[in-house]
Regions:
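Bacterial N-terminal signal peptides that target proteins for export
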Residues: 1-7
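C-terminal motif of bacterial Sec signal peptides marking the signal peptidase cleavage site
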Residues: 16-18
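Bacterial signal peptide processing site
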Residues: 20-22
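Functionally critical loop-and-helix segments that line ligand-binding/catalytic clefts
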Residues: 39, 45-66, 73, 257-337
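Substrate-binding cleft of extracellular glycoside hydrolase catalytic domains
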Residues: 49-225
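Acidic, His- and aromatic-enriched active-site or binding-groove loops in soluble protein domains
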Residues: 113, 119, 182-185, 189, ...
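Glycine-rich, charge-decorated loop segments at or immediately adjacent to ligand/cofactor-binding or catalytic sites
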Residues: 125-131, 249-261
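Aromatic-lined carbohydrate-recognition surfaces of secreted/lumenal glycan-active proteins
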Residues: 236-254
Length: 337
């Protein structure tokens, strides 16, 4: 069960009615020590890379898929909302919206830190490439007798039934489909992520988080997809590949991604953004999600908050740094350099 929910409930209530400048909330969060993360790292034998770099924890951020507009973003930043950073969605295969594009300078000038997100291919709960059934509505014409006595007559009616049929191949212009999950597509999407991040003017060393939604089963082909994505970003050398992942898949994905870092001669640990609702509290460190390697913890999903007269549907996160994608490392630190 979730513990110490008081501050989180206060934030939700303030979001509904609009609150003051929020300075006391931010300062109380920032006052927490990162020693908790270091203890968790020591206890599990894992590293807490971003937590190790700071002694001020608990930087609140939000993410929302559709850009709320400049006015809303500025109103939140200046109107008491406790959020120091925001997700920044690149146009990507499973998130083609371009609303965030070109907003890097606008948002940073407002004082926002940024977490760059690239929503790659997903399994959508099935085995990529395997035949699967989808519900299809089928219409048919049938005869029916209506009326009584001398007025009884035959009419035609259309009946719609839902049946399961084998899914067709992806449309020629499709960009997002479980059947696209493959190593070659991972490399293609990795190159696309790098190109789009560079086009928006992000500095070398910026972390790009590949969004991997929860998978009850993690197919080998998906593991090859995201490893190829990571290898491609590493090989380019300008940016750092990170991962957004659900806690259910986090350990396996982390081990896979870390192996790609080491194979590329990289000494850093990959930045991870872990989603888990249970136990979330805005005063906690990301590593308290249960994975000492977590740099960001997403703990509240699909809520609406209103600050300074602007309502936005958001997910709530806590990061070890004020700008999760700005990790403060050079883009190509290699073993032996």
């Amino acid at each position: 069960m979730r513990q110490d929910r008081g501050l989180l409930l206060l934030l939700a209530a303030c979001g509904a009615i609009g609150c003051g400048d929020g300075s006391s909330t931010r300062s109380s969060i920032a006052g927490l020590s990162a020693n908790v993360a270091e203890f968790a790292a020591a206890a599990t034998g894992q590293k807490a890379p971003m937590a190790d770099a700071t002694k001020n924890a608990g930087h609140l951020g939000f993410d929302t898929g559709t850009y709320p507009g400049d006015a809303a973003m500025l109103a939140w930043r200046t109107g008491g909302a406790p959020y120091e950073w925001t997700g920044y969605y690149l146009p990507s295969p499973c998130h083609p919206d371009e609303g965030w594009s070109g907003k890097r300078e606008t948002l940073t000038s407002m004082g926002y830190g940024l977490a760059v997100v690239y929503v790659g291919q997903q399994t959508w709960g099935r085995m990529p490439g395997a035949p699967h059934l989808v519900p299809v509505q089928v219409k048919r014409r049938v005869k029916a007798r209506v009326g009584r006595g001398a007025k009884r007559r035959t009419v035609w009616r259309t009946i719609t039934n839902t049946v399961l049929r084998r899914a067709p191949a992806p449309a020629p212009d499709a960009t997002c489909n479980a059947d696209f999950v493959a190593p070659a597509r991972g490399a293609q999407d990795g190159a696309d992520a790098v190109s789009r991040t560079a086009a928006d003017g992000f500095a070398p060393g910026t972390t790009i988080f590949l969004d991997l939604e929860r998978m009850d089963a993690l197919p080998q082909v998906m593991r090859e997809y995201y490893k190829a994505w990571v290898r491609t970003v590493l090989a380019d050398g300008r940016f750092m590949p990170g991962i957004y992942v659900h806690t259910f898949n986090a350990n396996t994905v982390y081990a896979d991604v870390k192996s790609q870092y080491r194979a590329a001669g990289r000494v850093e640990d990959p930045p991870f953004w872990v989603a888990k609702s249970k136990g979330f509290d805005v005063t906690k460190l990301p590593s308290e999600v249960g994975h000492a390697f977590a740099a960001v913890w997403q703990g509240v999903l699909d809520v609406e908050q209103t600050w300074n007269g602007h309502k936005i549907p958001i997910d709530v996160n806590v990061s070890a740094t004020q700008s999760p994608s700005a990790v403060g490392r050079p883009p190509a630190v290699r073993v032996g350099n």
